[in-house]
């Protein structure tokens, strides 16, 4: 039991995420903070996905005669899960990377709970002051530097965990904090999404292969502000469908950016993005949206990328938000892996994404 109530951590809470003191006992033993539920029913309903946190926090030491273990010691932790495509996770995950004590960090860095975000749910988009805008420009510039360095390392044979290490080290070289690290208990410093993974892929021991495509999603936190961007890259030579997919996703983003100005409606971005995707035989993911970003990692406004959405609000000078359309070769719907982060296409076909932070 916790002395200070926090919102229920269930994503589909039956009581609309009220404050709660009921803590997962296993998380408590492992030192994982912030795993609270409003009632036993919510805890039981989320057990199948929640328990994955325990596996991540406690790297498995498999038996040598375990048939599910590869000769190099790697393994698929979700062997009974019905994957939608050919990609598989390759565990164990490396230990959590350390951030030097002198680097300021967001409020969720220790316990995984973005308290400031939770407090400001439902509030309108914030207009930044000139000095805040300069901090946003600086952190976005640094995030671009880190992304470009990580992208230069892409080659067949490198693991996504090695890419995570590059992003982490380059981030702390800039006296910044890697925003994804421990955000809602995400275990790594960057998201690496390969082939059919739409977003939030967790870096692991899988080696990139010739013909893969990979999205690297970098966010830095510095001077109290977050800068967020991502791009999708080919690994060596890729097939024509993958090239078409990446071209389409890139065009969707940049045609939407052209619409951005004070007075433009957020809901109109999808009217430009979705026709481009359809004309190229692709679909637009509806589950995830762009978002406001400033001193909070995710905040208002929501920025849908599909047509006929019901997003509210107009763009105003001083707002900062992301546009990040996720484009699929097949159906727009998705499936989550049991790690509760990795989102893949429902049909196993490939997905690509490009993202920028807009001012």
List the model feature ranges, each with a label.
Residues 9-14, 25, 39-43:
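Cys/His/Pro-rich metal-binding microdomains
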Residues 2-5, 12-20, 31-35, 47, ...:
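Active-site neighborhoods and metal-handling regions in enzymes and metal-associated proteins
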